């Protein structure tokens, strides 16, 4: 084995020279230079500075403006809430531990940090699944008279939390475990060991199949059908130009969210699967640290995409920030089709 396994950790460094210490007790500067830990802390500080205001602003603007409280926006707000969980439950912890060079909060703190990071990521993934299904039902109309309403949105939000908890909670109760990963300053699922005492192998397989592969299949199926339907409707002119444009804009926004999710999380998932299927292979702490920390950027890209691609929300945000006055004037604010309201478009 090219790493050192302890009772509640796995350090990707051989202990032949006897330098390996518990990541809960002493700085891990034998894994990387102190300045590299400082860089991680600076990166986490940047994510906190960007992630908290932009996600809080998303919630605040939606609460302040009643016209933004549409069923589709419930799912988008769910993403903002999940991102705030990651900021407060994960990023602040990782910032502090990176400054100290090891996970100073012990195994209990590791469980909490790993839980919040996993919970936030899974809520994001399952929210994209719900959005994909919503787009499929609204645009493709497999049920001709179906309208995506408030009750459906609430059920969708509840579903994302149930599925996310089904992934994030088991390591807290004995099925797998959370351990420090990479440079030992943040925690995640144990992909490094089989750990039969906690049935680690079965949990990792369950997680990759149920909480990554199946959601991806659903998302790609829905958008494959959706692209075909949009092209067909455009060719046959089955709906008004305004409706088609609104549907396309919402669909484009959600597809971009999916693409950014894959950009953020696919490297982490790929490296985790490689480590799990090549246990005992030689890899350094940076190998897992970079994708793990890069995945954390997911907390800021969704609200940015939402603000940039949703004209109605952008105008409401400017109105809130400018004390009730929109500096762009009333013309843009009264633009016809709101992208977040297209989930209520009746079937043609």
From Swiss-Prot:
Membrane topology: Multi-pass membrane protein
Cystine residue pairs: 110-187
PTM annotation (N6-(retinylidene)lysine): residues: 296
N-acetylmethionine sites (modified residues): 1
Positions carrying Phosphothreonine: 336, 340, 342
Gene Ontology biological process terms in this record: absorption of visible light; cellular response to light stimulus; detection of light stimulus; detection of temperature stimulus involved in thermoception; G protein-coupled opsin signaling pathway; G protein-coupled receptor signaling pathway; gene expression; microtubule cytoskeleton organization
Membrane-crossing residue ranges in chain numbering: 37-61, 74-96, 111-133, 153-173, 203-224, 253-274, 287-308
Pfam families per UniProt: 7tm_1, Rhodopsin_N
CDD domains, A to Z: 7tmA_MWS_opsin
Keyword annotations from UniProtKB, A to Z: Acetylation, Cell projection, Chromophore, Disulfide bond, G-protein coupled receptor, Glycoprotein, Lipoprotein, Membrane, Metal-binding, Palmitate, Phosphoprotein, Photoreceptor protein, Receptor, Retinal protein, Sensory transduction, Transducer, Transmembrane, Transmembrane helix, Vision, Zinc
Compartment annotation: Membrane; Cell projection, Cilium, Photoreceptor outer segment
Gene Ontology MF: a single term: retinal binding
Keyword Metal-binding: yes
Residues found modified as Phosphoserine: 334, 338, 343
PANTHER family reported in the protein's UniProt record: OPSIN (PTHR24240)
Assembly, per entry: Homodimer. May form a complex composed of RHO, GRK1 and RCVRN in a Ca(2+)-dependent manner; RCVRN prevents the interaction between GRK1 and RHO. Interacts with GRK1. Interacts (phosphorylated form) with SAG. Interacts with GNAT1. Interacts with GNAT3. SAG and G-proteins compete for a common binding site. Interacts with PRCD; the interaction promotes PRCD stability. Forms a complex with ASAP1 and ARF4. Forms a complex with ASAP1, RAB11A, Rabin8/RAB3IP, ARF4 and RAB11FIP3; the complex regulates Golgi-to-cilia rhodopsin/RHO transport in photoreceptors.
Protein name from the UniProt record: Rhodopsin
Organism: Rattus norvegicus
């Amino acid at each position: 084995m090219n790493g050192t396994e302890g009772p509640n950790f796995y350090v990707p460094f051989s202990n032949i020279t006897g330098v390996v210490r518990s990541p809960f007790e002493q700085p891990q500067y034998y894994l990387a230079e102190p300045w590299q830990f400082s860089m991680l802390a600076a990166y986490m500080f940047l994510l906190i500075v960007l992630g908290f205001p932009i996600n809080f602003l998303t919630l605040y603007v939606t609460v302040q403006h009643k016209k933004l409280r549409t069923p589709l926006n419930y799912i988008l707000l769910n993403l903002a809430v999940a991102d705030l969980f990651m900021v407060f439950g994960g990023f602040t912890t990782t910032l502090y531990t990176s400054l100290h060079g090891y996970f100073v909060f012990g195994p209990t703190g590791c469980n909490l940090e790993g839980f919040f990071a996993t919970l936030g990521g899974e809520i994001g993934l399952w929210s994209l699944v719900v959005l994909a299904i919503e787009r499929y039902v609204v645009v493709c109309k497999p049920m001709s008279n179906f309208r995506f309403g408030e009750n459906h949105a609430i059920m969708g939000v509840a579903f994302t939390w149930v599925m996310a908890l089904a992934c994030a909670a088991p390591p807290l109760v004995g099925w797998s475990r959370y351990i420090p990963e990479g440079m030992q300053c943040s925690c995640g699922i144990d992909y490094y060991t089989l750990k039969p005492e906690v049935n680690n192998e079965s949990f990792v397989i369950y997680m990759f199949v149920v909480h990554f592969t199946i959601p991806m299949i659903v998302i790609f199926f829905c958008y494959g059908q959706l692209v075909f339907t949009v092209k067909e409707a455009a060719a046959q002119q089955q709906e008004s130009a305004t409706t088609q444009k609104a549907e396309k804009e919402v669909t484009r926004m959600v597809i971009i969210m999916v693409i950014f999710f894959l950009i953020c999380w696919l490297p982490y998932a790929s490296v985790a699967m490689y480590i799990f299927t090549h246990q005992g292979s030689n890899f350094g702490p940076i190998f897992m640290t970079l994708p793990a920390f890069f995945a954390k950027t997911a907390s800021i890209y969704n609200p940015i995409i939402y603000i940039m691609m949703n004209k109605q929300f952008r105008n409401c945000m400017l109105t809130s920030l400018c004390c009730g006055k929109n500096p762009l004037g009333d013309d843009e604010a009264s633009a016809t089709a709101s992208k977040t309201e297209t989930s209520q478009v009746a079937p043609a």
